[in-house]
């Protein structure tokens, strides 16, 4: 999972929603890995038992018991395989939805950064306008009080 941000905007803090989300993601990852381990172990154990039970023996009663055991083990293998398929589907959905969530978070972060840049730019433009206005007033006062202007008007 991609939890790293882009070029940061300077808002600090190592805790909060991001740390909580990372802890929740780690916990979910551990639970999913445990499910995978359990299901794979079940498939392997049941397959091993089917192979062990499938040896042909003489008494018909024992053969029917072994057949029942094989069917039971095969059923457990199918259940474990079904659980693995559901897990894969859940992982795909999680990847899709967490991808959208992290994308939305990134978009919101970028919007906030651009809003801050727009504010900074507006303040800079206002300061430049104030400076230009003050300089223009100063130039006008020098022009109207200068001796050269008086000689040009005569």
From Swiss-Prot:
<keyword id="KW-0175">Coiled coil</keyword>
<dbReference type="GO" id="GO:0016592">
    <property type="term" value="C:mediator complex"/>
</dbReference>
<keyword id="KW-0805">Transcription regulation</keyword>
<feature type="coiled-coil region">
    <location>
        <begin position="102"/>
        <end position="141"/>
    </location>
</feature>
<dbReference type="Pfam" id="PF06179">
    <property type="entry name" value="Med22"/>
</dbReference>
<dbReference type="GO" id="GO:0003712">
    <property type="term" value="F:transcription coregulator activity"/>
</dbReference>
<protein>
    <recommendedName>
        <fullName>Mediator of RNA polymerase II transcription subunit 22b</fullName>
    </recommendedName>
</protein>
<keyword id="KW-0539">Nucleus</keyword>
<dbReference type="GO" id="GO:0006357">
    <property type="term" value="P:regulation of transcription by RNA polymerase II"/>
</dbReference>
<dbReference type="InterPro" id="IPR009332">
    <property type="entry name" value="Med22"/>
</dbReference>
<comment type="function">
    <text>Component of the Mediator complex, a coactivator involved in the regulated transcription of nearly all RNA polymerase II-dependent genes. Mediator functions as a bridge to convey information from gene-specific regulatory proteins to the basal RNA polymerase II transcription machinery. The Mediator complex, having a compact conformation in its free form, is recruited to promoters by direct interactions with regulatory proteins and serves for the assembly of a functional preinitiation complex with RNA polymerase II and the general transcription factors.</text>
</comment>
<comment type="similarity">
    <text>Belongs to the Mediator complex subunit 22 family.</text>
</comment>
<comment type="subunit">
    <text>Component of the Mediator complex.</text>
</comment>
<keyword id="KW-0804">Transcription</keyword>
């Amino acid at each position: 999972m991609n939890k790293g941000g882009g070029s940061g905007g300077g808002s600090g803090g190592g805790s909060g929603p991001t740390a909580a989300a990372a802890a929740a993601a780690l916990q979910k990852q551990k639970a999913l890995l445990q499910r995978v381990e359990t299901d794979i172990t079940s498939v392997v154990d049941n397959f091993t038992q089917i192979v062990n039970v499938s040896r042909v023996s003489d008494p018909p009663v024992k053969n029917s018991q072994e057949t029942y055991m094989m069917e039971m083990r095969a059923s457990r293998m199918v259940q474990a395989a079904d659980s693995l398929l559901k897990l894969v589907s859940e992982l795909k959905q999680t990847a899709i939805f967490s991808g959208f969530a992290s994308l939305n978070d990134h978009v919101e972060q970028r919007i906030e950064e651009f809003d801050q840049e727009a504010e900074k730019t507006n303040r800079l433009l206002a300061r430049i306008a104030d400076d230009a206005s003050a300089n223009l007033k100063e130039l006008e006062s020098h022009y109207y009080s200068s001796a050269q202007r008086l000689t040009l008007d005569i």
